[in-house]
Amino acid sequence: SKEVMKQMTINFAKPMEACKQELNVPDAVVQDFFN
């Protein structure tokens, strides 16, 4: 269901954000990853 996907994305995105800030990954790389 959409709601489950949304929750998974949110749960996945939080640690991703932390990693991104630690590694200083540009947003473009993250966008590529999600597309």
Swiss-Prot record:
UniProt keyword list: Pheromone response, Pheromone-binding, Transport
GO molecular function: pheromone binding
Gene3D superfamilies referenced in this protein's UniProt entry, alphabetically: Pheromone/general odorant binding protein domain
Gene Ontology process terms (BP): response to pheromone
Entry-linked InterPro entries: Odorant/phero-bd_Lep, PBP_GOBP_sf
Source superkingdom: Eukaryota
Tissues expressing this chain: Antenna.
Subunit architecture: Homodimer.
Entry similarity comment: Belongs to the PBP/GOBP family.
Function summary: This major soluble protein in olfactory sensilla of male moths might serve to solubilize the extremely hydrophobic pheromone molecules and to transport pheromone through the aqueous lymph to receptors located on olfactory cilia.
Record's protein name: Pheromone-binding protein 1
Organism listed in the record: Lymantria dispar
